[in-house]
């Protein structure tokens, strides 16, 4: 029985392999202690005499039977010679029912060898995962340690999104505001461009209208200066030239006065005239006082002296011996001077002086009758049979003067040729010194009441009553009376300015043209020859140069065919060729 107990107690101890399996099962949940287990296992292999009494301390207490000092003490060994029991069956199974309860409850059934291999593989994979996780953390730490600005990971993502949305919204608002500003600026520029275009159109229309008016005024000025060849600057007392040929064309001309001066004062020596007018006039010397009236021109005022050897004693006696009042004496002076000029019209000097007198009186805007009036042509019927020479430089002026008798002038619209017989019967042939035998003073009284000065500005809008002007430019009267509306008004039409409407036909003017054939039609101006052209044709004729042509008869024939125009007396080219053909 004692032997059995000893065997039983010896069988309760575990072999080293069993101890290793037990430790592995117990330490399966503690991987870091594997090295310690391996160390303990190695110690257990090197020390087989250790007992399992002190497992927790890493060494086993040996029983007295396993003492190495007693080789025959019956210690357990791998060799058969070391076993104390020679007849011991090694295949003896010590496991009996209920033997697992002898040493206490185990944490779990012992795993098999296959399960142990799986656990080892699992432990190896876990170790590898732990090592890879450490490497990853180490790599993250290395990446975070790079130089430069690190992203702010502390702020939440929602806050960053809100800031991004606010920035985008502000950008869109600025963009929309910029677009609105650009659209507003474009609208303003478009409006300014439209206004500028409209203003340019109005200014362009106004310029066209002014150009039309300028052409109209130039046309009127050409009627006064051209046509007869006389300019406003050449109409002065000392103008002894060929420009004096058309003095009987009845043009109403005056030079433009200086600012602040009355018209005509520079022609008649205004300061001297004013000083002479301020002197007291008495009845003893009416010739010296009344001869200074600007509207009355005598031979003494033109020539200053009788250097031409003309008989002027009769006119001088008629003036000096008359103690009548001033107005009749002035009229007698003018009448005697004009009759003296008409009686000596055959000589070139007298004809030129008479034309100078007419020119000065018209330039001074005095309303006295010209040399074509009946009062100055008292002795024309007596003097017409005298032969006149046209070889001097004033021959053209004399020829044009006789040819101009076919037309009237401003003061005497009746032509001198038609009113010759009437003027001879109603006007005395010789001037008398008595005031009762002379006609009324006429318009000279008005001129003298104004101090001898006549202001043509008062009659600036006056027009000559000639049918030729009315027939050619009849619409200008209505343009002045009813001017065009303002350019800004809606009733204004720009086409009316650019293309003026032709004037309507005047029935009264057509009737007058039918009755009076002495008016030049506007469409036949190219076929009309002026006095200058007729005189040039006469000079080109050899018989005229030799003196074989009767100029008086030729002038009378041309006068019967003459027509009146705004530029003077004109004759149809066909009539001139017929008359000159008969003379040849």
Curated annotation (Swiss-Prot):
It comes from the Eukaryota. PANTHER family: AP-1-LIKE TRANSCRIPTION FACTOR YAP1-RELATED, TRANSCRIPTION FACTOR KAPC-RELATED. Residues 377-480 are annotated as: Transcription activation 2. Contains two cysteine rich domains (CRD), referred to as the N- and C-terminal CRD's, n-CRD and c-CRD, respectively. A nuclear export signal is embedded in the c-CRD, with which the nuclear export proteins interact only in the absence of disulfide bonds (or otherwise oxidized cysteines) within the c-CRD or between the c-CRD and the n-CRD. Residues 182-189 are annotated as: Leucine-zipper. GO terms for biological process: cellular response to stress. A motif (Bipartite nuclear localization signal) lies at residues 35-42, 68-75. Residues 36-48, 112-144, 170-179 have a biased composition (Basic and acidic residues). Residues 300-309, 363-379, 422-437 have a biased composition (Polar residues). Residues 159-180 are annotated as: Basic motif. Signal peptide: none annotated. A motif (Nuclear export signal) lies at residues 549-556. Transcription activator involved in oxidative stress response and redox homeostasis. Regulates the transcription of genes encoding antioxidant enzymes and components of the cellular thiol-reducing pathways. May be involved in antifungal resistance to voriconazole. Residues 23-179, 267-379, 418-441 are annotated as: Disordered. This is AP-1-like transcription factor yap1. Depending on the oxidative stress inducing agent, yap1 can undergo two distinct conformational changes, both involving disulfide bond formation, and both masking the nuclear export signal, thus abolishing nuclear export. Belongs to the bZIP family. YAP subfamily. Changing residue 558 to W: Leads to the up-regulation of the expression of atrF and subsequent resistance to voriconazole. It comes from Aspergillus flavus (strain ATCC 200026 / FGSC A1120 / IAM 13836 / NRRL 3357 / JCM 12722 / SRRC 167).
């Amino acid at each position: 029985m004692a032997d059995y107990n000893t065997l039983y107690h010896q069988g309760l101890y575990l072999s080293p392999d069993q101890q290793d399996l037990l430790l592995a099962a117990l330490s399966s949940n503690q991987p870091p202690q594997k090295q310690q287990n391996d160390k303990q296992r190695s110690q257990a292999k090197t020390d087989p005499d250790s007992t399992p009494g002190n497992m927790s301390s890493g060494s086993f207490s040996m029983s007295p039977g396993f003492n190495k000092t007693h080789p025959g003490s019956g210690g357990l060994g791998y060799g058969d010679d070391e076993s104390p029991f020679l007849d011991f069956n090694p295949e003896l199974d010590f496991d009996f029912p209920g033997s697992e309860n002898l040493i206490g409850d185990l944490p779990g059934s012992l795993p098999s060898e296959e399960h142990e291999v799986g656990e080892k593989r699992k432990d190896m994979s876990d170790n590898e995962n732990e090592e890879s996780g450490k490497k990853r953390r180490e790599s993250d730490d290395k990446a975070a340690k790079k130089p430069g600005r690190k992203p702010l990971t502390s702020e939440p993502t929602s806050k960053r999104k809100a800031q991004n949305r606010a920035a985008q919204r502000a950008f869109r608002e600025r963009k929309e505001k910029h677009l609105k500003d650009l659209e507003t600026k474009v609208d303003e520029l478009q409006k300014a461009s439209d206004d500028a275009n409209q203003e340019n159109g109005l200014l362009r229309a106004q310029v066209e209208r002014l150009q039309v008016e300028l052409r109209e005024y130039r046309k009127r000025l050409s009627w006064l200066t051209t046509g007869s060849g006389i300019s406003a600057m050449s109409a002065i007392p000392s103008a002894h030239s060929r420009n004096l040929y058309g003095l009987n064309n009845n043009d109403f001309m005056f030079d433009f006065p200086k600012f602040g001066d009355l018209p005509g004062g520079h022609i008649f020596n205004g300061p001297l005239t004013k000083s002479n007018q301020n002197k007291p006039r008495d009845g003893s010397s009416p010739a010296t006082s009344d001869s200074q009236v600007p509207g009355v021109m005598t031979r003494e005022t033109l020539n200053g002296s009788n250097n031409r050897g003309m008989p002027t004693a009769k006119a001088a006696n008629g003036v000096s011996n008359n103690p009548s009042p001033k107005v009749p004496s002035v009229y007698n002076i003018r009448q005697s001077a004009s009759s003296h000029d008409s009686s000596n019209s055959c000589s070139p000097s007298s004809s030129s002086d008479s034309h100078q007198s007419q020119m000065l009186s018209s330039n001074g805007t005095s309303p006295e009758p010209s040399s074509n009036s009946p009062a100055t042509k008292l002795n024309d019927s007596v003097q017409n049979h005298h032969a006149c020479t046209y070889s001097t430089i004033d021959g053209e002026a004399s020829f044009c003067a006789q040819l101009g008798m076919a037309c009237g002038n401003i003061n005497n619209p009746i032509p001198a040729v038609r009113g010759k017989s009437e003027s001879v019967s109603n006007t005395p042939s010789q001037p008398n010194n008595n005031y009762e035998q002379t006609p009324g003073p006429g318009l000279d009284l008005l001129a003298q009441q104004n101090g001898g000065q006549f202001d043509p500005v008062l009659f600036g809008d006056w027009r000559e009553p000639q049918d030729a002007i009315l027939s050619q430019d009849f619409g200008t009267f209505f343009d002045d009376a009813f001017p065009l509306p303002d350019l800004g008004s809606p009733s204004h039409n720009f086409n009316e300015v650019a293309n003026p409407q032709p004037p309507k036909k005047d029935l009264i003017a057509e009737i007058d043209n039918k009755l009076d054939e002495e008016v030049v039609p506007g469409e036949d101006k190219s076929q009309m020859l002026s006095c200058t052209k007729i005189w040039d044709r006469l000079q080109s004729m050899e018989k005229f140069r030799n003196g074989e042509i009767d100029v008086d008869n030729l002038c009378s024939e041309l006068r019967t065919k003459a027509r009146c125009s705004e530029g003077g007396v004109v004759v149809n080219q066909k009539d001139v060729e017929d008359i000159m053909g008969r003379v040849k």
